[in-house]
Regions:
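Nucleotide-activated sugar donor-binding and catalytic core shared by glycosyltransferases
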Residues: 1-412
Length: 412
């Protein structure tokens, strides 16, 4: 009889709420794959704490956005980087997993690699090296052994850019398809009158400020073109007051709903959507809701477009490799253009049918081949990296990289 596997100690460092959500699912999947003989150290939030992590400090200490807030708290953040890396080095874990928040987690990884050069380091969630500062991919070779990608085209990008081995483990939204997709009754509501149109102007106050007027004007024009429809606006408690204030000037104020369950319920009934660029466009696409994406930034941020190397800012378009979803940016994010793009999606013409077919292709590209969850694939990749380091070679206990169709992004 072979000896049972020895206990593992894994360091996990997440820098914000989204990383905390990925982290707790990874911890759970590692225990399911390995059993209870596994201990965790590092930094996380409430979800990871519920799975047994005693965070070195509150995740709120490092979850800072924006240039000015970061500069104000820079000395404290640098201190947390040092504290985190020193604690990991002292603990001598079997592996380090860093999750998103590269400005923090990658600095921790570099310090740990210098002190423990043989420690396997896994980066869960790729930085957007395919869009911004591509030289980061090659630089990561010095301190990352494996990248776990959420988007199916990212392994190809790392191969092209000369970065670490990158594998597609699946996007966490794949685990939520039952919540996103309609049951038979909801599917019938999608096809009934009046149609449900969902509008999502963003989750930040700056987005609300820049988009609400244009979205409201577009919806007024849409009503003139197609007649009555039911308008639903999902939002979050921290921006509810701003959203309600801005929507009060619309000709017909929307039905405003709060929280994720209500948002997904609206998606399941929606005929079409108008949404700010972001993860929500991928949620809508996986829910099978034809949409128009839009965004506006300030003058300073607009200049950064010359440094960004992607043909689209919408995740579904990048995954598909084609401009299947209309996007209206900056000056194009105007009521007339938004209404003109949205109206055909509420009807049943060729524009809607083409996008519905594209969303089906997106679903096929993102699907994992064996039915296991993204968290299970991520756990297998982490364990494979540890086993491979011990054996002096890579062990392929994860999903093999898959390439998207070879085609340029077409406008249309």
């Amino acid at each position: 009889m072979s000896d049972p596997p020895r206990a593992l100690k894994i360091a996990i460092v997440a820098g914000e709420h989204s990383g905390d959500q990925l982290g707790f699912k990874l911890m759970r999947a590692l225990r399911e794959a390995r059993g209870t003989d596994i201990a965790f150290i590092g930094v996380g939030g409430e979800a990871m704490a519920d799975e047994g992590l005693r965070s070195l400090f509150p995740i709120a200490d490092i979850a800072v956005m924006g240039v000015v807030p970061v500069l104000k708290r820079l000395p404290a953040i640098l201190g947390r980087i040092r504290e985190t890396s020193e604690a990991i080095v002292a603990a001598r874990p079997d592996a380090l997993v860093i999750i998103d928040s590269p400005d923090f987690t990658h600095r921790v990884a570099r310090r740990v690699r210098k002190a423990l050069p043989g420690l396997p380091i896994v980066d869960y969630v790729s930085p957007s090296v395919w869009a911004w500062r591509p030289g980061r991919a090659r630089a990561m070779l010095a301190y990352v052994d494996r990248v776990l990608a959420l988007l199916p085209f990212e392994p190809e990008a790392y191969l092209r850019l000369g970065g670490p081995l990158c594998v597609y483990v699946g996007h966490p939204l794949i685990e939520r398809l039952d919540e996103l997709r309609p049951n038979p009754e909801e599917a019938r509501r999608r096809e009934s009158e009046p149609p449900v149109v969902v509008v999502l102007p963003g989750s930040r106050r700056s987005e609300i400020h820049r988009l609400m007027a244009a979205f409201g004007g577009a919806l007024d024009l849409l009503r003139d073109r197609i007649g009555a429809f039911e308008l639903v606006l999902p939002t979050l408690p921290h921006i509810e007051a701003e959203v309600r204030g801005a929507a009060a000037s619309w000709r017909e104020p929307p039905h405003i709903v709060l929280g994720e369950p209500e948002r997904y319920a609206a998606f399941r009934r929606a005929r079409a959507a108008l949404a700010a660029s972001g993860t929500v466009t991928l949620e809508l696409a996986l829910a099978g809701v034809p949409l128009v994406g839009a965004y506006k930034v300030g003058l300073v941020e607009e200049q950064l477009k010359y440094l960004i190397k992607v043909p689209s800012i919408l995740l579904p378009n990048l995954i598909l490799g084609e401009a299947a979803i209309p996007e209206k940016l900056q000056r194009q994010c105007a009521p007339e253009e938004l209404a003109a793009a949205l109206a055909p999606l509420v009807g049943d013409g060729p524009e809607r049918q083409a996008q519905v077919k594209a969303l089906a292709r997106l679903d096929a590209l993102m699907r994992l081949p064996d039915g296991r969850s993204p968290s299970a694939h991520a756990a297998a990749a982490v364990l494979g990296t540890i086993a491979g380091r011990r054996a002096g070679r890579d062990l392929d206990l994860f999903v093999a990289p898959r390439k998207r169709p070879e085609k340029r992004l077409k406008q249309g």
